Amino acid sequence: MVTIGTLGSHSALNILSGAKDEGFETVLLCEKSRKFYERFRVADEIMYLDSLSEIKREDIQEKLNERDVILVPHGSYISYLDLDFLENEFSVPIFGNKFLFRFESDRELERKWFLKAGMRIPRTFEPETIDRRVIVKYHGAKGGKGYFTVDTPEEYFEKKIEGDVQIQEWIHGVTMYFHYFYSPLQKELELTSIDRRYETTADAVHTFPDREPTYVVVGNFPLVIRESLLEQVFDIGDKVVDASRNLHEKGLIGPFCLETIVTDAPEIVVFEISARIVAGTNFYVPYSPYTYAKYFEPMSAGRRIAREIKMALEEERIKDVVS
C-alpha cells in the first residue's frame, strides 16, 4: 500500500490531512525542533531529522522506498534542497513534475515560460534603465524575503545588492494568487482556491509610514474573485499548462499557483508561478467555494492530491502523476 509523505513545513498539515481523508497511511519527515506536529493527528509516523536536507541520505531514501512512499512537494523542497540532486539522484517518487521546479526558481526561465504561454507579464529592466517604480526580487522560493522597491537607478545602486535579482515593473492593482490543479488522468484543469498573502511590513506600513516596506510572507487571506473574471482565470491557467509541455514532456501535474496582480481594467497580470502546492491553500481545509461547487463534498488541495494518486493507482497509471 502506498504511503503519502512530505516534509514538516509549509503545507504539511494540509497535505497529510488530505491523504488521511482518502485512506492513505502518512509519514512526515521533520526537523527535531518542530515537535508541534505531534499535537496534530495527520502523521502516522514522524521521522525526525537534524535538518530537512538529510532527506538526501541514501539510508533515508531506502527507508522511504521500502515503505512505498510518494512524497508531495511544497515550497520547502525548493528552498532547501538542491535541484540538481532532486532531478538526477533523488530516488523517491515525487508527486507532480519535479523538472519544472527549476523554472520557478530561476526568474529568467520563468519569464520564458510565461512568454511561451502568451500571458500579460510585467516588463523587466536593467539597473541603468529604471525609469519608474520597480520591485527587485531574488530568485527562488523564499517567501518574499529581501524584496524591495526603487524608483531610480541611483536608489538601486545604493542598495549594494549581492546575488542575482530580477527587476520587475511595479504593476498598480491588487494581488491575487490563483490555485489550480491539473489532472493528467482526466486531462482537466480545476481552480481550487484563491488567496492573497499577509506580508511584513507591507501590510503594516500604515503603522510606520516612514519605514520601507518588506514582503516576508507570514500568513494568507482567503479570497473569491468576481465571477465575471473567472474566464480570464481559467484562460491563463490553460495557457500555462499548454506551454509547460514545451518545457518537459509531462508538463504540469497536480497543484500549481499563478501569482498575479489584477488591475482596474480589469486585467490579470502574471508575475510568478509555483509549480506545486502553495501555502495559500491551507485556509481551504476542508474545502473552498470552488472545490465545493465542483465536488459537493469536502475537497482540500491536500485531498485532491491524494484523490489523484488513488485514481492513478486504480488505473495503473501512477507513472503519469509522479517524477
Q: Where do the protein language model's features map onto the residues?
A:
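A short, Lys/Arg-enriched amphipathic alpha-helix followed by its capping loop at the start of a domain
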Residues: 15-24
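ATP-dependent carboxylate/phosphate-activation module, predominantly the ATP-grasp catalytic core
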Residues: 179-244, 274-306
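Active-site nucleotide/adenylate-binding loops and adjacent lid/helix of ATP-dependent enzymes
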Residues: 7, 99-193, 226-238
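Conserved N-proximal alpha/beta basic substrate-recognition cap immediately N-terminal to
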Residues: 38-133, 142
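Extreme N-terminal starter segment of soluble prokaryotic enzymes
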Residues: 1-4
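Cysteine/selenocysteine-centered motifs that mediate thiol-based redox chemistry or coordinate metal-sulfur cofactors
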Residues: 303-323
